[in-house]
Amino acid sequence: MNDLTKFTNQIAKPETFDQIQIGLASPERIRSWSFGEIKKPETINYRTFKPERDGLFCARIFGPVKDYECLCGKYKRMKYKGVVCEKCGVEVTVTKVRRERMGHIELAAPVAHIWFLKSLPSRIGLLLDMQLKQLERILYFESYVVIEPGLTPLEKYQLLTEDELLDAQDEYGEDAFSAGIGAEAVKHMLMNLDLVQEKEDLLQELATTKSELKPKKIIKRLKVVESFIDSGNRPEWMILDVVPVIPPELRPLVPLDGGRFATSDLNDLYRRVINRNNRLKRLIELRAPDIIVRNEKRMLQEAVDALFDNGRRGRVITGANKRPLKSLSDMLKGKQGRFRQNLLGKRVDYSGRSVIVTGPELKLHQCGLPKKMALELFKPFIYARLDAKGLSMTLKQAKKWVEKERKEVWDILDEVIREHPVMLNRAPTLHRLGIQAFEPVLIEGKAIQLHPLVCSAFNADFDGDQMAVHVPLSLEAQLEARVLMMSTNNILSPANGKPIIVPSQDMVLGIYYLSMDRAGEPGEGMMLADMAEVHQALEAKAVTLHSKIVARVPQTDEDGNQYLKRFETTPGRMLIGECLPKSHKVPFEIVNRLLTKKEIGDVIDQVYRHTGQKDTVLFADAIMALGFRHAFKAGISFGKDDMIIPDSKDALVAETKELVADYEQQYQDGLITQQEKYNKVIDAWSRCGDQVANAMMEELKSSPIDPETGRQKPINAIYMMSHSGARGSPAQMKQLAGMRGLMAKPSGEIIETPIISNFKEGLTVLEYFNSTHGARKGLADTALKTANSGYLTRRLVDVSQDCVVIEEDCGTERALEMRAIVQGGSTIASLGERILGRTLAEDLIEAKSGEVIAQKGELLDEAAIAKIEAAGVQSARIRSPLVCEATQGVCGKCYGRDLARGTPVNIGEAVGVIAAQSIGEPGTQLTMRTFHIGGAAQVNEQSHLEAISDGTVQYRDIPTITDKRGRRLSLARNGEIVVIDTEGRERAIHRVPYGTHLLHENGAIISQGDRLAEWDPFTTPVITEKPGIVRYQDLVDGKTLTEQTDEATGMSSRVVTENRAAGRGKKEDLRPRLTLLDENSGEAARYMMAPGTTLSVEDGQQVEAGDILARASREAAKTRDITGGLPRVAELFEARKPKDNSIIAKIAGRIEFVRDYKAKRKIAIIPEEGEPVEYLVPKSRVIDVQEGDYVKKGDNLISGSPDPHDILEVMGVEALAEYLVAEIQEVYRLQGVKINDKHIEVIVRQMLQKVEITNGGDTTLLPGEQVDLEEMLETNGKLEEGQQPAEGKPVLLGITKASLQTRSFISAASFQETTRVLTQAAVEGKKDSLIGLKENVIVGRLIPAGTGAGMNRMRVAASSRDAALRASYRKLQESLIAPATAAEEHAAELAQGPEAAIGDDPLATVEGETHGTDADAGDYLIEGDEA
């Protein structure tokens, strides 16, 4: 019976294996897979369409073409199953075997496998320690190689040309040494390798080597050698003797009409291999001349190369139509390859798509499904229901009824659809809210109706968007759709925890209109008793929606009782108040104000937090209906006269024009440079544009009292739309009624002449032309942006996909310090915002009273945050995914709150993917451009600081000096001025440049608006710290010093220049500097002068402390492009080194200038104790420190954007995380996108998974190699007591690199560089234990996240239970063999516990960890044993 059910060798179910291993196939293995050798290149007979025998489609090898029928037709039907026909040799079985049976080709000469030869680094090359060039010369028959030199002076593996070989044979005799050519020679060389010996030699060499670069190469070779030893692969398997042939159904040949065939490219490639192989066999049999055989062998090698990876070496082999043939590698690679096309994304049944239209009368959980569509999608359910009701006898009849659409069918469709959710999806699905479940409502027509509130989640609009419908079939799928994916369960956005179901556009406008109050409306000051009176008064027109009235509004107290409370309000706001849920947590106050889109979002947020999901959904639906209704009733519209151009515009423009003319004159007079003029002009115009815009806004905002009626004039409609957040923005209004402002050239620079007109006035021809650049660039950008953003998301998902919450608490002691982000003068993100929804790592104690505000391990919710903010806490230590010590994934405590639910995160939540989606989804809103900032445009704004609040001022790390005028000057390079308000909170942190004039004492009390500091924005001074006499050193006129006279003012100044001696002779080593002599003529201080510095003192001048010796121009340091938008985010996540990166001090110590080279100078930091650290700095860069300065660890020696790798090395993981989070948030903040920090932290955690071994200890790990942190810990765990563990330092990998280095090779191969990943994995014999999400999708399992994680746990438990049962059955059988006596049985009954009597299954509580074996079952059988 068993044989009957097992038709064919059935494919293993995806649940039945735990790991997938990849390795090299030995020739024996390939032959064992094969069902026969393919000897002929023929495919099928073009007349009979029957496969040729021994050809590529041979039925004898691969199986029958028709089910249960041999080729010649002698045996037909099931009864001959398994018979092999003696005439045609075909086994009678199902055709499906043609999809799984393989064949092989026996090669007449071995060939090298191109993956192991050409995929960098070449594995064969590394093993033999030869260059790829040399290997290719051997393999493609260009030169001989010495395999065994014997006693001759030839080197082992030395290459010889034909002539050299003949000479050598003449000289030493033919048998004195062995040489070979082609793949055979390489195969010999690989077979003769003694890997274990090789490993020992390499380790020896590694220990003794002295050079810098050698160890890297040795480690590379060592890893390959070790991987061959560990994996059990043999090196000679990289050379093929047999080529496997994949099953014919996987490379089909289909006859087209007209006698032609469509075929898979693989067949062509195989045919070439077979043809050349057969020809080579014949040539060898005929004993053809060597040169001909050799040529044929080379061609065979090329044919096999093309089959495996076409185009990897030499020309691409093309088919008849000049199209490159798709080789086996191409089948896997890229978007169209097997991984991404068929395994990660499949097309599914039971789906349809149609245009969407708005469905404002739907409830939030519903969508309108066209009847026709529903009928088609739910067909099987309808058939089943028809059958169950006994309406149709047969399936055929049911089909007929459905096709005819009889009225019974529609009734049944209604029944089937009730409570059966469907999933709607809109492409592009950028985050998980792009697929949501709804209950279908049948509608006429052909378009899907979508609820307006979910549009923002789908990013849908109704201008012709289409959406797809999917039907969840199984009960579990329906359950998940209803419980997890229903639109009512997705009120909050997973990216930032704010509601995503927020009214937009018309609804916002309607609600804004309702909540306005206006002076002088009819009925102002009326007292109304309750809601009913308000409605009556509105009907009677006694009041308008905007009249200011006093009314009693029903409120709910904490016990749920209603009471009335008086409010000054308007009837419109009371209408909104009616929609609010009845709860004391959401009082009427929260809607008793002017509601813009942002405020409505806050109201929905509060309703959700305090009253729960159901009420929120009802409230959202109610407020939507209200908004639409009143937007319609208000009849808001605007005409061109609503765009009011401010009267002050002309005056402002004229004033700016004068300024610009003035700058032009200054430039002509030589007072300012071209660059400075440009910056000032741009500045002036942008200021003018802003002033015009402000004037316009003021004018639009004002709604004066109409003298005739005494009522306020209606407010400007355009202003209403913009201010409420319904549509339009101040920037757009500025273009309509202000001035268009400055435009950019295609190169990105800003054109100096602005567009003065606005769209209402109309542009001049020149202005119109200037504005076309920007417009066109915008369109081109948009197209690029989508692709770039999508790619960023894909890389992020790939790096973080296996990050899942796997346990409640990992118990780590580490934590991140969080404080408010203060930039310049304002708080960008308060402490509360940053720690909301996180877990505290230690008790928060109020400084003044010492009481504990929040406990360690508490999840901070809104209430706790309010307490913390009130107490004025400065910083808090919180848990973060970055410090989590869970081995795979993260733990719930470190992650904190699940943002989309507002509850602690569940185990199994795929937080990695959510993080990737949250960062990638707003990617399309970011800009693509790099901002070009011309020098002073940013700098000259700021030449002083003002206090933003009352309080005290504190200087951190600012040494000061007082000059002879009594001014305090800062000598700090990295000092900070901190403003602390009266409650002791840090309100602002400012970094000020060197030489700043500080106006207050440290700790002085200041009031708001006081000046704190001023500085010269254009130059950096060199200040002397001691009195003395100045001497010029190496400042030679004409070489390193020039006199420059300013034509405009006639003043001359001395400028240090770079010494470019004309003579080709020995260049003098001139290091221009000033030295300061003290009273004993000893050298007191040295100041190096960078080129471009203007000297302010004479040689021999007496100076006091605090005097300025020289000024270096700051212009040069500032003109660097600021990369913004998407490219910046990608740059940070890829951990790229910035172009002009800053140099960070690795240790604390004093600075010393060591010496100058041609283009660089060497500076060193001398610590108090220990070795000095040296840096090479290009001369073109301005060095921020002077000789003798004391620097702290992590200070900038040279300004620029820091290199994240440096930050990690010098400052550690926490500082790096802080930097990356701050920089990435900065980019998103500019676009007004909110993303929670923890998402970025999850990604950064994934980038920090690897460590570089610094000390191998007693392990097999080598210093300098990169391994997973887990791997290092595992290796250390295997050590004996007293052995030294390996140590390592964390390394930062960019997201692409990190994804390619995941432990799962399946996941890495499906990401990028497929061949390289698979080659590497095969050599190492990697096992993929299917831990991440992607691998499981690829092998077709449930992912180990969400409900899948639970299923996995259950499966493990079930299998261990099965094992226990099996063992108990065995016990039972054993007891049957020797029957027990009555007395023994009686004793056994008494010995049994009371559980046995209750009938509780003692095995029901089994929870195992592994797939059970009988051995595991031991513990559960104790009760049975006692018997």
Curated annotation (Swiss-Prot):
Underlying gene: rpoC
Binding site for Zn(2+) 1: C70, C72, C85, C88
Quaternary structure and interacting proteins, as annotated: The RNAP catalytic core consists of 2 alpha, 1 beta, 1 beta' and 1 omega subunit. When a sigma factor is associated with the core the holoenzyme is formed, which can initiate transcription.
Protein residues bound to Mg(2+): D461, D463, D465
Organism: Novosphingobium aromaticivorans (strain ATCC 700278 / DSM 12444 / CCUG 56034 / CIP 105152 / NBRC 16084 / F199)
Cofactor note: Binds 1 Mg(2+) ion per subunit.
Cofactor: Mg(2+); Zn(2+)
Reaction equation(s) it catalyzes: RNA(n) + a ribonucleoside 5'-triphosphate = RNA(n+1) + diphosphate
Entry's family note: Belongs to the RNA polymerase beta' chain family.
Full protein name: DNA-directed RNA polymerase subunit beta'
Enzyme Commission code(s) on record: 2.7.7.6
InterPro entries, A to Z: DNA-dir_RpoC_beta_prime (IPR045867), DNA-dir_RpoC_beta_prime_bact (IPR012754), RNA_pol_asu (IPR000722), RNA_pol_N (IPR006592), RNA_pol_Rpb1_1 (IPR007080), RNA_pol_Rpb1_3 (IPR007066), RNA_pol_Rpb1_3_sf (IPR042102), RNA_pol_Rpb1_4 (IPR007083)
List of residues binding Zn(2+) 2: C810, C884, C891, C894
Entry-linked NCBIfam families: rpoC_TIGR
GO cellular component, one term: DNA-directed RNA polymerase complex
Chain intervals for the UniProt region annotation (Disordered): 1044-1065, 1394-1427
Keyword terms: DNA-directed RNA polymerase, Magnesium, Metal-binding, Nucleotidyltransferase, Transcription, Transferase, Zinc
Biological role: DNA-dependent RNA polymerase catalyzes the transcription of DNA into RNA using the four ribonucleoside triphosphates as substrates.
Entries under HAMAP family matching the protein: RNApol_bact_RpoC
